[in-house]
Amino acid sequence: MSLLTEVETPIRNEWGCRCNDSSNPLVVAASIIGILHLILWILDRLFFKCITRFFEHGLKRGPSTEGVPESMREEYRKEQQSAVDADDGHFVSIELE
């Protein structure tokens, strides 16, 4: 028997709570936890890809260098810097007199 059939039953053409101890702090806490769980589940289904991408990659930017030897990291930095330096040649310096 599900919880909904026990708690929410039609009473005199209205929906009401059949349990008498609804003011019990344990029942209130369980209700709050249930509502929060439902909200989090809905958000998880809506934003599943964003959430998993965040936990997989975190806040890191750029390619991961984990497990890459330092010599390869330095070589990569030099390649990136040389690419930036090569692009500087495209700019024309204009001096106004």
Swiss-Prot record:
Membrane topology: Single-pass type III membrane protein
GO BP terms, alphabetized: protein complex oligomerization; symbiont genome entry into host cell via pore formation in plasma membrane; symbiont-mediated suppression of host autophagy
InterPro entries from the UniProt entry: Flu_M2 (IPR002089)
Ranges where the record places region Disordered: 59-88
Residues carrying covalently attached carbohydrate according to the record: 20
Subcellular location(s) per record: Virion membrane; Host apical cell membrane
Lipidation (S-palmitoyl cysteine): 50
Modified positions (Phosphoserine) in chain numbering: 64, 82, 93
Protein name (Swiss-Prot/TrEMBL): Matrix protein 2
Source taxonomy: Viruses, Riboviria, Orthornavirae, Negarnaviricota, Polyploviricotina
Gene behind the chain: M
